[in-house]
């Protein structure tokens, strides 16, 4: 069914080309007053549905403005609006997009609700600060390497309590290896005190000490910014219910980069309708918070878990042309990247079935494919818990390996039957031979 009042906006950094029903486009600027004029013009024309390309971040101000005005706004992938070769202009793109939208050929991409977008902005900014702080630690390590100080070879991390205590003392002027080693935690001194003392003997060049001082100041600066982000994130989260449903005590350790928000696990469970997503393997409180910041709490917009995993870029692609079949690799969005990072934490797990699944697949297909497959399983469980309310029950590595063994045995029996043979247990065969 045709919609002659469907509009399309070709978004740019300086101009917005708007066409209604495929008619000659009108051009608007991108300053705030021009965006208000664009909105008023669309409303005066009787437009109720607007589509636009996701061009960088330029579409976000207009999207929020039109959404607040009550219009149906669709953010579409630029691949859907490609014009015929030789007709690439902003005016033509706007008309062609409006024609496609008028015929119902443009599929809306996922855009979270306004409150989730606000949380998303804070979380992404915080992640940028965490990455910048990590680069400061690398600069500290570089300064130590230039001074031939091998502290990072004998302690776990320069950003830990002991590492930072030593760095601050060096910046303050302390040079004695014994005095610096005394600042380390008692566990380190008890196990490898002499190794730490030897690692702290080096050359104290002024330029390298200046690099260390600057890196430490930058580290402290980013820690303050991260703490500011934590306060903003806590402010946009819903208030904590004083009488929440009881949650079983979690034995999972909190990550070093996790936000410092009081009772975050209970708040997340409250947001998700009482579902504790941290029961899923590899999903920490911070991981669940990041996922909610990307996809929100209503995952029913994806009809099935296959739709959700495909949107996240975790489903295997396919491209058939005649007799040729080939997989199509496409980039994973932030949600898919989060699931892949979480999957990596299960690689060395000793008692989780999904860890055994990863190792079995990695031995046969390689680590990259195994990581993607494991991430897809995690994404599927995330969808099922959020939409269907399923409870994840860990079956354990031993039971999983037993299921794999039985599956292999059934496959061998089928193969033996096809070849006209019969499988005989090893103990029975030995007895018959004797």
Regions found by a protein language model. Name each.
Residues 1-434:
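A detector of single, family-specific signature residues
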């Amino acid at each position: 069914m045709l919609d002659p009042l469907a509009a399309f906006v070709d978004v740019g950094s300086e101009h917005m080309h708007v066409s209604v029903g495929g008619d000659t486009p009108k051009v608007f600027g991108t300053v705030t007053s021009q965006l208000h004029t664009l909105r008023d013009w669309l409303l005066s024309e009787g437009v109720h549905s607007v589509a636009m390309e996701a061009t960088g971040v330029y579409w976000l101000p207009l999207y929020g403005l039109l959404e607040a005005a009550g219009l149906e706004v669709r953010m579409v992938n630029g691949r859907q609006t490609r014009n015929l070769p030789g007709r690439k202009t902003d005016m033509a793109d706007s008309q062609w997009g409006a024609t496609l939208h008028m015929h119902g050929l443009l599929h809306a991409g996922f855009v979270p609700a306004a409150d989730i977008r606000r949380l998303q902005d804070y979380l992404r900014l915080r992640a940028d600060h965490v990455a910048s702080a990590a680069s400061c630690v690398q600069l500290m390590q570089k300064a130590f390497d230039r001074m031939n100080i091998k502290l990072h070879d004998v302690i776990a991390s320069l950003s830990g309590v002991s590492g930072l205590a030593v760095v601050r003392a060096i910046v303050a002027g302390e040079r004695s290896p014994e005095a610096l080693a005394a600042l380390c935690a008692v566990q380190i001194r008890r196990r490898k005190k002499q190794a730490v003392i030897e690692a702290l003997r080096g050359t104290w060049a002024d330029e390298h000490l200046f690099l260390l001082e600057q890196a430490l100041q930058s580290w402290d600066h980013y820690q303050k910014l991260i703490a500011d982000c934590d306060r903003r994130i806590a402010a946009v989260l819903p208030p904590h219910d004083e009488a929440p449903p009881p949650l079983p005590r979690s034995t999972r350790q909190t990550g070093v980069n996790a936000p410092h928000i009081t009772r975050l696990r209970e708040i997340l469970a409250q947001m998700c309708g009482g579902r504790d997503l941290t029961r899923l393997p590899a999903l920490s409180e911070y991981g669940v918070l990041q996922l909610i910041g990307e996809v929100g709490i209503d995952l029913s917009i994806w009809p099935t878990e296959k739709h959700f995993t495909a949107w996240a870029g975790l489903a295997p692609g396919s491209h058939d042309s005649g007799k040729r079949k080939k997989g199509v690799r496409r980039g994973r969005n932030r949600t898919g990247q989060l699931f892949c990072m979480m999957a990596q934490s299960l690689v060395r797990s000793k008692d989780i079935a999904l860890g055994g699944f990863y190792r079995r697949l990695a031995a046969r297909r390689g680590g990259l494919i195994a990581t993607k497959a494991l991430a897809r399983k995690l994404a599927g469980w995330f969808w099922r818990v959020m939409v269907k309310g399923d409870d994840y029950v860990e079956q354990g590595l031993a039971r999983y390996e037993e299921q794999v063994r039985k599956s292999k045995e059934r496959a061998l029996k089928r193969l033996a039957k096809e070849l006209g043979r019969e499988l005989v247990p090893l103990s029975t065969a030995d007895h018959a031979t004797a």
